[in-house]
Structure formats: structure tokens, C-alpha cells
A protein has these predicted regions:
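Alpha/beta-hydrolase fold nucleophile elbow
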Residues: 129-142
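Short glycine-enriched nucleophile-adjacent loop
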Residues: 145-156
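Active-site machinery of serine-nucleophile hydrolases
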Residues: 47-122
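Catalytic active-site module of serine/aspartate enzymes centered on a nucleophile-bearing elbow/loop
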Residues: 255-274
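Solvent-exposed loop/turn segments at secondary-structure junctions
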Residues: 58-62, 93-98, 142-146, 167-171, ...
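A domain-start/cap signature at the N-terminus of enzymes
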Residues: 1-52, 86, 229-240
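Loop/turn elements at helix/coil->beta-strand transitions in domains of secreted/extracellular proteins
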Residues: 48-52, 83-88, 132-135, 156-161, ...
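The feature captures the conserved acid-bearing segment of alpha/beta-hydrolase catalytic domains
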Residues: 156-258
């Protein structure tokens, strides 16, 4: 088992990155090692809890030979603008065939186990017994989008914030309802909004119409219906954090551009001109 290499600076750990192999919860996944990328911003050595970001990557032209670093480089997991102590985890998915990946090991509570494992490894590295989760953020790009919806349906710790970057393709009509999963998002959205404004959350969907437009627009309708029942002053604030938006960027660039801004503030306004 590899050790996380942390660099203390005064009373904090400086920002860093590590790659771990043979992650227990990910053992059923086919693909290369290492299978887990962990990143963190500045974290106080006395911290009892941290925010956690889990990022589900999409397909790869390299198929089963894809190195995890390929996805880390374009993930947008840049926390330099984030003030809260945060640990990000990017698990390698399960290679199916051709370019396709999914995340079956994160179903049935697997994401909870992944988060617990990552925090345990980090806590051990700083000489702590445990670290608790404060806020949980789930982000997904491309082929990671629909698996993220499935993960939410089977987790004991639903995310406070959900960011999906051109990933809501819907289901193959040959296997059933192409809009299956909307009911999960609607349930999560209702539960999430019930916690506002005391515990703020977000749902940001960035999409390209010809690729993920139909499902994404249905999510937009769910948001509109839910916010219609909210007191107007609060609804105005929520609309900045719960919304869908058309991307003016090429598919592969969306997460790398948008996620750093959303990790800084979930109500971020994107300047597509730059």
C-alpha cells in the first residue's frame, strides 16, 4: 500500500496530488493502475472534517490502456480558488470495450466506501485517526454523467452539489425508458432544496444541445417546477446555483474550464468569450 506524500507547512498541509493503486473498492474495475487520483488544497493539520469532491470521467480513445493521468489532466480539479479544505478523488472507471467506461463498483454504496477509504488514507498520512466529510460534491463529464445519476440513487450520503458537463445522454432506448434517471434527480433535488438556505447546495448542468440536450432540458424543467414553489426572494438566489446552461466550448474542454470556477463558487457565471 503506497503512502500519501504530504508536505507540512506550519500548521497546514500544502496542496498536492497523489496516485494510488489497487484501491479496494475499485478492484472489480478493468483498466490500468494506478486507479485513484487524489488531490487536495491547503488543509489544516487540526481539521476534523473536509469537503470531498468525487469526479467521474468519461470515455477514452485509448480504451482499456487509458492512464488515469489522461483524465486528471482534463478534469478541471483545480482547487486553487477554493477556500474550504477539500480533498478530490478521481477514480478510474471500468473499461467495457472500445472507448467505453462505466462505474459499477461505485453503485450500492460504493461511492461511500471510496470516500471513506480516501479520507482514511489522508487521515493516516497526517497522523489523525479519522476525517469526517463536511460537504460532498459529485462532478461528472461525458460518459460519467449517467453513472453519476445511478450513484446518487444508491448512496447513503447524497451530494450537496452536483455538476455535470455534457454528460446526460440518457439511456439506450433499446434497454427501456431513455429518460430513466430523471426520477432520481427529481428526488435528490427535492431533498436538496428542502435544506436550503441553511445548507446550500447546487445543481449545474453544462451541455451541448446535439449531444445531451434532451435529457439536460428535462432536468431544467424539473428545476423550474421545484423553484416555482419557493419564496421569490430565495428562488432568485437559488436560480444562480440550480440551473442548466448551453456550453459554447468543445465537449472535451468543458470540465477543464468550468469546474475550477464552480469549485470556487457554485453560483459562478461563465464568461464564454474568453
Amino acid at each position: 500500500m503506497q503512502n500519501l506524500a504530504l508536505t507540512p507547512s506550519g500548521d497546514s498541509v500544502t496542496p498536492g496530488e497523489a496516485y494510488l493503486a489497487d484501491t479496494p473498492v475499485l478492484r472489480p474495475h478493468a483498466g490500468t493502475q494506478p486507479d485513484l487520483c487524489v488531490r487536495w488544497n491547503r488543509i489544516p493539520l487540526t481539521a476534523s472534517s473536509v469537503d470531498v469532491v468525487v469526479y467521474l470521467h468519461g470515455f477514452s480513445q485509448r480504451g482499456g490502456a487509458m492512464p488515469l493521468a489522461e483524465k486528471a489532466a482534463n478534469s478541471g480539479l483545480d482547487m486553487s480558488g477554493r477556500k474550504r479544505p477539500t480533498i478530490a478523488m478521481l477514480p478510474r472507471g471500468n473499461w467495457l470495450s472500445y472507448t467505453w467506461y462505466d462505474f459499477p463498483a461505485l453503485l450500492s454504496g460504493g461511492m461511500d466506501r471510496l470516500v471513506d477509504y480516501g479520507l482514511q488514507r489522508f487521515a493516516r498520512a497526517i497522523g489523525r485517526g479519522t476525517l469526517a466529510v463536511d460537504r460532498l460534491i459529485l462532478a461528472a463529464h461525458s460518459g460519467g454523467g449517467m453513472p453519476a445519476v445511478d450513484v446518487i440513487a444508491e448512496t447513503r450520503r447524497p451530494p450537496d452539489e452536483l455538476f455535470v458537463f455534457d454528460g446526460l445522454y440518457g439511456r439506450d432506448p433499446a434497454t427501456g425508458n431513455p429518460m430513466r434517471g430523471l426520477e432520481t434527480i427529481d428526488w435528490w433535488l427535492g431533498d436538496r432544496l428542502a435544506r436550503e438556505p441553511e445548507r446550500e447546495g447546487a445543481l449545474r448542468v453544462i451541455y451541448i444541445e446535439q449531444q445531451t440536450g434532451p435529457f439536460s432540458r428535462q432536468v431544467g424543467e424539473l428545476i423550474s417546477r421545484r423553484l416555482a414553489d419557493v419564496e421569490p426572494a430565495l428562488a432568485e438566489a437559488l436560480q444562480r446555483r440550480y440551473r442548466i446552461e448551453v456550453s459554447l466550448l468543445q465537449h472535451s474542454q468543458i470540465a477543464r474550464r468550468c469546474l475550477p470556477e464552480l469549485l470556487t463558487g457554485s453560483d459562478a457565471e461563465f464568461d464564454w468569450s474568453r
